[in-house]
């Protein structure tokens, strides 16, 4: 198994893969160049907190996917960027015949695993800490596991949950939904925050496999989640 760290500006990848000499860093660099070039011409794409209307047809794949995920999740395109880079990086490795790859990009994960794997849940919760994770059964298809927080990280969030973790077939969608649902984690106490976020999740049930919401001493979930297990404490580079 190969382990690799890739740091390119705001992209911080931790990679575990069964592929040697995968050239993923070069692939991600090209993705970032396409994204940065598009942003210079389309400030709304970069700055909007809502989906952006467009009529362009000749777009690079990363821009297309971010537009699509944004429209599904009712967030701005950049709310989906980290998950999209993870998703496309995983697709690239799968195209090279990988059967086991985990790509973590600042807490947004894309994974394919032909054997059992454990994925940590980063919440920084004062009670749970960073010592729990999902035990993932072997699967042949990609899975996105993305987390948003109102308390940690540099991404914009209007809610106050310790963490909202979304599991979806596409990491770009999981990333956008984590942002959208986390924005609704508001209320006079942690119970209300979890309840309001769960209510918001109901509007997107066709897009996710499961959602886990952690706020202080309250935890809520919707959909089908993997088994939650205890892990060693870990940190994520945001």
Swiss-Prot record:
Transmembrane segments: none annotated. Belongs to the UPF0280 family. HAMAP family: UPF0280. This is UPF0280 protein Msm_0088. It comes from Methanobrevibacter smithii (strain ATCC 35061 / DSM 861 / OCM 144 / PS).
């Amino acid at each position: 198994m190969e382990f690799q760290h890739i740091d390119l500006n705001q992209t911080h990848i931790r990679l575990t893969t069964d592929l040697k000499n995968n050239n993923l860093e070069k692939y991600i660099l090209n993705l970032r160049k396409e994204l940065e070039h598009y942003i210079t011409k389309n400030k709304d794409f970069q700055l909007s907190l809502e989906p952006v209307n467009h009529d362009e047809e000749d777009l690079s794949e990363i821009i297309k996917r971010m537009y699509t995920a944004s429209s599904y999740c009712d967030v701005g395109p950049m709310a989906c960027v980290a998950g999209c880079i993870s998703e496309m990086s995983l697709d690239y490795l799968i195209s090279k015949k990988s059967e086991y790859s985990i790509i973590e990009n600042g807490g947004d994960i894309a994974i394919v695993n032909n054997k059992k794997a454990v994925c940590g849940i980063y919440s920084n919760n004062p009670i749970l800490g960073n010592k729990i994770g999902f035990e993932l059964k072997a699967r042949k298809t990609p899975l996105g596991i993305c987390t948003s927080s109102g308390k940690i990280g540099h991404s914009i969030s209007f809610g106050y949950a310790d963490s909202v973790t979304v599991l979806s077939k596409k990491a770009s969608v999981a990333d956008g939904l984590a942002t959208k649902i986390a924005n609704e984690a508001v209320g006079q106490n942690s119970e209300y925050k979890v309840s309001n976020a769960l209510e918001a999740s109901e509007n997107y049930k066709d897009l996710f496999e499961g959602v886990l919401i952690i706020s202080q001493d309250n935890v809520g979930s919707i959909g089908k989640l993997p088994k939650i297990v205890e892990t060693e404490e870990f940190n994520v580079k945001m």
